[in-house]
From Swiss-Prot:
It is found in: Cytoplasm. Belongs to the KdsA family. This is 2-dehydro-3-deoxyphosphooctonate aldolase. It comes from Francisella tularensis subsp. holarctica (strain LVS). Pathway: Carbohydrate biosynthesis; 3-deoxy-D-manno-octulosonate biosynthesis; 3-deoxy-D-manno-octulosonate from D-ribulose 5-phosphate: step 2/3; Bacterial outer membrane biogenesis; lipopolysaccharide biosynthesis.
Amino acid sequence: MKIANFEVGNGKPFFLMSGPCVIESEQMAMDTAGYLAEVTKDLGINFVYKSSFDKANRSSINSFRGLGVDKGLEILAKVKKTYNVPVVTDVHEDTPFAEVAEVVDVLQIPAFLCRQTNFILEVCKQGKPVNIKKGQFLAPWDMQHVVTKAKSTGNEQIMVCERGVSFGYNNLVSDMRSLEIMKATGCPVVFDATHSVQLPGGQGSSSGGQREFVPVLSKAAMAVGIDGLFMETHPNPDEAKSDGPNSFPMYKIKEFLSLLKELDHLVKSQPKTEL
């Protein structure tokens, strides 16, 4: 499959989905998109800018959710035009799908909604590439049913994304086997390195996180030969309005991506060990 003008999967180099969790302001979106576009261009890594106009699943009613669909899409369209990069954003059950699909290049189904059949069908009917987050409550092989629903619309541009599995209360773990298992769906596999270290509800009215583990999990995922890496970034994670505790510090990303690119090339240039 293709996102914008680049191919995804089938042993191609990994692509990056990255940006702040939520659109906090137009200026911040432009600044982060510009920086990430420059870094990925220098490194030769295909890049999709990610940020959400609405975070509908925040822990608290008082949490910042975003700028809304109209302003959010206006900003994403400006990012896309200014920096010539594809964009991805979350959609929800009350999202005007056609309106969003006119702007973005990839529609993303949140993990909590990955079992909602009618929702999945409507999203996939838009004919855009779709990234489906695996629910924290699902086994990796259960994603086959989700993919079958999605592809029943005739849309073959489906990706599946691992973002950790619930491990007791307020904790997630990443089972690296799931990345290999989900390859059996026939879809490109994406690893969400930042939500995988989230501690859901771990701060009472908001989620905590362990961003110090993002590097090690990202490197482990590269060893599996993933097709894409999802990694939320922020110029100052401690001041982020959403998911700061698990966001990667943006100004440290270039050196780290350079390492991941080397690992990705090494793994994909070697024959698979069959047992």
